[in-house]
UniProtKB/Swiss-Prot annotation:
Motif (DDXXD motif): 310-314
Domains: entry comment: The Asp-Asp-Xaa-Xaa-Asp/Glu (DDXXD/E) motif is important for the catalytic activity, presumably through binding to Mg(2+).
The organism of origin for this protein: Ricinus communis
Binding site for Mg(2+) 3: 464
One Pfam match: Terpene_synth_C
Function: Catalyzes the cyclization of farnesyl diphosphate to alpha-copaene and (+)-delta cadinene.
UniProt record similarity statement: Belongs to the terpene synthase family.
Biological process, per Gene Ontology: cadinene biosynthetic process; diterpenoid biosynthetic process
Reaction catalysed by this enzyme: (2E,6E)-farnesyl diphosphate = (1S,8aR)-delta-cadinene + diphosphate; (2E,6E)-farnesyl diphosphate = alpha-copaene + diphosphate
UniProt cofactor(s): Mg(2+)
InterPro entries named in the record: Isoprenoid_synthase_dom_sf, Terpene_cyclase-like_1_C, Terpene_cyclase_plant_C1, Terpene_synth_N, Terpene_synth_N_sf, Terpene_synthase-like, Terpene_synthase_metal-bd, Terpenoid_cyclase/PrenylTrfase
Identification of the protein by name: Alpha-copaene synthase
Residues given in the record as Mg(2+) 1 binding sites: 310, 314
Broadest EC class assigned to this enzyme: lyase
Length: 558
């Protein structure tokens, strides 16, 4: 991207006449999707009444398969894993929970198959059961190293590798296992058959714990079909489920795209990123299940308007204009728009309209839950206050300390705001007490924010310094501690790893709030890992094109 300085005539409340204001703004590429999702993308030729009837029949067969596992649960962990990775576990939550509880209570320590032990550990931890990592000590030799014989068990090493990503702080054996499996899986990769090599290659780049559920489902459908022991009923059910959900997602995206088109962002706010499709993809990552349809639409609107706010504060508006905008958002009153420049009025009125729409929907369904919108508004106000603080630093050429920077930057990731907004879709599960908890910077939301902030800084700090922009965490750390860029990035990556461990720990029973709330935070963090792992995939959306297409555009062949 290139740096562009544009002189745009605007009128503000402090100017009686229109005058040219020099603005430093980056030139972002336009949406790569055009009007694609405005078209009718129905799967009508694939999904009709007879297919839905077939789907229900397959669903009951899969349910029976899972229930029958109670007879020999420890031998059937692979089926539970497949059901979940194929993305259909949400149909059978109670049945899976029953099987895993039996697996947990019936366990004996005489199992010496690495794949079985590691798979059991991962599945139980994924469900909040705090099993001990000491079970992996028996795979070490007399010198305390993992046995070299394990190198010949590629499937077992892969299973152990995946299990290590459920670790918490202080579990040294899992840290050692991660180093051992990463090194040796990379070493044996060229010698393996195509099927297993593909799984390992994908896992080394995207472990299950950090992968978005929809992407994992689409990826694993192809992998599962090549396994010798695959179940035809389960595979066909997963394919139909994926396509039926994709049809629903396309209809929602069509609604969102029409709404976005009505705002005419590309013309009226040309300095901003036009990324509504990527915003929707992000929210499908947070919750993909059909019951969250309205929540997905509203969350997409929230993240899209937040993106406009981000670009306005970060990339276009003057400090004076932003003081007025921040004050208006603090007031949260439509009358406050009168003090804003014309281009800001679009953003401000849209922001209020989105939350009003959410409020009206909740009032229709359950008035007692209206408190939830209050918390969503309040955290948005915190975000714009933090945006403004960073603008003041930028305009005063001030490099904050890391402590100052992180206090603001963890808010401007928007992770706390998106977490609290995502709880709106959970309705009565998210109680007033749970919102209070979420508003007090709990460990899991802070950890998610750290992952987002540091991963974003690692991939974008060089570009950010090519324009007038607040110092990133990398520059703040270098100035405060005299470290090299390489040292800072290494440290940040370690902090991201530790933050994931904190996320994992907060998801172990007993949990501070219901698990569905924690799952939203985990999924938001997974989205960050996908978007920012190697580059800024939101700004440079070509990077995410294949991901978006696989989930939202291209059906699974049936």
């Amino acid at each position: 991207m290139s740096l562009q300085v544009s002189a745009v005539p605007i009128k503000t409340s402090t100017q009686n006449a229109t005058s040219a204001v020099k603005r430093h703004s980056s030139t972002y590429h336009p949406t790569i999707w055009g009007d694609h999702f405005l078209a009718n993308l129905s799967h009508s030729k694939i999904i009709d009444g007879s297919i839905e009837q077939q789907f229900e029949g397959l669903k009951q067969k899969v349910r029976k398969m899972i229930i029958d596992l109670n007879n020999e649960p420890c031998k059937k962990l692979g089926l539970i894993d497949a059901v979940q990775r194929l993305g259909v576990g949400y149909h059978f939550k109670s049945e899976i929970e029953d099987v895993l509880q039996k697996v947990y209570h019936d366990y004996s320590d005489d199992e010496d198959d690495l794949n079985t032990v590691a798979l059991r550990f991962r599945l139980l931890r994924q469900h909040g059961i705090k099993v001990s990592c000491a079970i992996f000590e028996k795979f070490k030799d007399s010198e305390g190293n993992f046995k070299t014989s394990l190198i010949n068990d590629a499937l077992g090493m892969l299973s152990l590798y995946e299990a290590t990503h459920l670790s918490i702080r202080g579990e040294d054996v899992l840290d050692e296992a991660l180093a051992f499996t990463t090194t040796n899986l990379q070493s044996v990769l060229p010698q393996l058959n195509t099927h297993l090599a593909a799984q390992i290659s994908r896992a080394l780049n995207r472990p299950i714990r950090k992968y978005l559920p929809r992407l994992e489902a689409r990826n694993y459908i192809d992998i599962y079909a090549t396994e010798e022991s695959y179940n035809t009923t389960l595979l066909n059910f997963a394919k139909l489920d994926f396509n039926m959900l994709q049809e629903l997602h396309q209809k929602e995206l069509n609604v969102v795209t029409k709404w976005w088109k009505s705002l005419d962002v590309a013309t009226k706010l040309p300095y901003a990123r036009d990324r509504v499709v990527e915003c929707y993809f992000w929210m499908v990552g947070v919750y993909f299940e059909p019951q969250y349809s309205f929540a997905r639409i509203m969350m997409t609107k929230i993240i899209a308007i937040t993106s406009l706010l981000d670009d306005t504060y970060d990339n276009y508006a003057t400090g004076e204009e932003l003081e007025i905008l921040t004050e208006a958002i603090e007031r949260w009153d439509i009358k406050a728009k009168d003090a804003l420049p014309e281009y800001m009025k679009i953003i401000y009125t849209t922001l209020l309209d989105i939350y009003n729409e959410y409020e009206e929907n909740i009032a229709k369904e359950e008035k007692s839950l209206l408190y939830s919108v209050y918390y969503a508004k309040e955290v948005m106000k915190r975000v714009v206050r933090a945006y403004l603080a960073e603008v003041r630093w930028r305009d005063n050429c001030y490099t904050p300390t890391m402590e100052e920077y992180m206090q603001s930057a963890l808010l401007t990731t928007c992770s706390p705001m998106l977490a609290i907004a995502s709880f709106l879709g959970l309705k009565e599960i998210a109680t007033k007490e749970a919102y209070e908890w979420a508003s007090e910077d709990p460990k899991i939301i802070r950890a998610s924010s750290i992952v987002c902030r540091l991963m974003d800084d690692i991939v974008s700090h060089e570009f950010e310094q090519t324009r007038k922009h607040v110092a990133s965490g990398v520059e703040c750390y270098i100035k405060q501690y005299g470290a090299s860029e390489e040292e800072v990035i290494k440290l940040f990556r370690k902090e991201v790893t530790n933050a994931w461990k904190d996320l994992n720990e907060e998801c172990l029973n007993p949990t501070p709030v219901p698990m569905p709330m924690l799952e939203r935070v985990v999924n938001l963090t997974r989205a960050i890992d996908v978007i920012y792992k190697d580059d800024d995939g939101y700004t440079n959306s070509h990077i995410m094109k294949d991901y978006v297409a696989s989930v939202l555009k291209d059906p699974v062949p049936v």
